[in-house]
Amino acid sequence: MSDSKCDSQFYSVQVADSTFTVLKRYQQLKPIGSGAQGIVCAAFDTVLGINVAVKKLSRPFQNQTHAKRAYRELVLLKCVNHKNIISLLNVFTPQKTLEEFQDVYLVMELMDANLCQVIHMELDHERMSYLLYQMLCGIKHLHSAGIIHRDLKPSNIVVKSDCTLKILDFGLARTACTNFMMTPYVVTRYYRAPEVILGMGYKENVDIWSVGCIMGELVKGCVIFQGTDHIDQWNKVIEQLGTPSAEFMKKLQPTVRNYVENRPKYPGIKFEELFPDWIFPSESERDKIKTSQARDLLSKMLVIDPDKRISVDEALRHPYITVWYDPAEAEAPPPQIYDAQLEEREHAIEEWKELIYKEVMDWEERSKNGVVKDQPSDAAVSSNATPSQSSSINDISSMSTEQTLASDTDSSLDASTGPLEGCR
């Protein structure tokens, strides 16, 4: 590293077991989380005068997988612009040449909490439906550009105390082709759709299954399909939802179909029993109607056969959600992915390194006085959208205010390489 560059623009601080070498504009660094993708600190941006999250990517050039993931996250974050997607405020490296390049820092909005901290709260129907609406709007925005998130889970969804919600972590997101086959194990196990578990081709509504799992967790206060491994995860799904039909079985690879057909048969549990009235808010007759609608939405998202599962557009128009519908949010213009070969790219580590370095340098070129050119002037602050239907929604009372923009500590990727681990 150049001493002159480091001394004039950067300073170093020890954060847990990692050294953060950051621009001097970012002060008061405080670790708030870590995960497979990197370490995150809260900081104060002295240029913009706001609190931000600074994420140091974890060993981005350790191997081709890490490098491609880092490139993918950077490209997608630079493209998306939606109130329910976390905003990228800055990108930098303390190294001044490609030869020295080894660290990538992403600066993003800082939120108050992630959904892990909200799950154990008692949410009324207004708050729950509004959180889900925002989740679906963010996903719709990604899907409109052919981007599947693939790693939706409570720790990847962050909120403010006013109920504003944003989706983050795009290291596993990818652009989509119709009914394509991809790496089988991408989403954290508990939120993994059946078509992923079984190694089938999958499409955008793989994210809808994850939303259904998250909604179920918000309702029950606990993970709804908590498998101990890949096979047990499938067992937990069919024990509650029932063994899928012969029509679905025909879509499976022969070895997987043989395994699934030889498992014990389960009739499934009615959704009225999986999600009984008493676990929902029930203070009024209106709550009873909302409970019925919420349960119906769950029953349409948690469908084993993806061809019969609700789409994001249908979910946004569902009676439980549509009360919040705003075309400006739900039908926002799709992001323009400027790298058409984002998924087809395969490179050696050094080539990935050069691509990422160019992205970082491009950002620096477009930056001036701490604000990126052409970036909306309010992009540096969190959205304070207020649902027109109710003012009470704008407070998640007693929410922890420990600020966060961090994944949980578990890895998003499991080590297995095939459907049901080769059907043990």
Curated annotation (Swiss-Prot):
Gene Ontology MF annotations: ATP binding; JUN kinase activity; protein serine kinase activity; protein serine/threonine kinase activity; protein serine/threonine/tyrosine kinase activity
Sequence ranges assigned to domain Protein kinase in this UniProt record: 26-321
Regulation: Activated by threonine and tyrosine phosphorylation by either of two dual specificity kinases, MAP2K4 and MAP2K7. Inhibited by dual specificity phosphatases, such as DUSP1.
Binding, ATP: I32, G33, S34, G35, A36, Q37, G38, I39, V40, K55
One Pfam family cited in the UniProt record for this chain: Pkinase
Listed InterPro entries: Kinase-like_dom_sf (IPR011009), MAP_kinase (IPR050117), MAP_kinase_CS (IPR003527), MAPK_JNK (IPR008351), Prot_kinase_dom (IPR000719), Ser/Thr_kinase_AS (IPR008271)
Modified residues annotated as Phosphothreonine in this record: T183
Motif TXY: positions: 183-185
Subcellular location: Cytoplasm; Nucleus
GO cellular component, one term: nucleoplasm
Catalytic reaction annotation: L-seryl-[protein] + ATP = O-phospho-L-seryl-[protein] + ADP + H(+); L-threonyl-[protein] + ATP = O-phospho-L-threonyl-[protein] + ADP + H(+)
Region Disordered: start-end pairs: 368-424
Phosphotyrosine carried by residues: Y185
Gene3D superfamilies in the cross-refs: Phosphorylase Kinase, domain 1, Transferase(Phosphotransferase) domain 1
EC number(s) on file: 2.7.11.24
Catalytic residues (UniProt): D151 (proton acceptor)
Residue spans of biased composition, Low complexity class: 388-417
Protein modification: Dually phosphorylated on Thr-183 and Tyr-185 by MAP2K7 and MAP2K4, which activates the enzyme. Autophosphorylated in vitro.
GO biological process: one example: positive regulation of macrophage derived foam cell differentiation
Record's comment describing the protein's domains: The TXY motif contains the threonine and tyrosine residues whose phosphorylation activates the MAP kinases.
Subunit structure, interactors included: Interacts with MECOM. Interacts with DCLK2. Binds to at least four scaffolding proteins, MAPK8IP1/JIP-1, MAPK8IP2/JIP-2, MAPK8IP3/JIP-3/JSAP1 and SPAG9/MAPK8IP4/JIP-4. These proteins also bind other components of the JNK signaling pathway. Interacts with NFATC4. Interacts with ATF7; the interaction does not phosphorylate ATF7 but acts as a docking site for ATF7-associated partners such as JUN. Interacts with BCL10. Interacts with CTNNB1 and GSK3B. Interacts with MAPKBP1. Interacts with POU5F1; phosphorylates POU5F1 at 'Ser-355'.
Protein's UniProt name: Mitogen-activated protein kinase 9
Gene: MAPK9
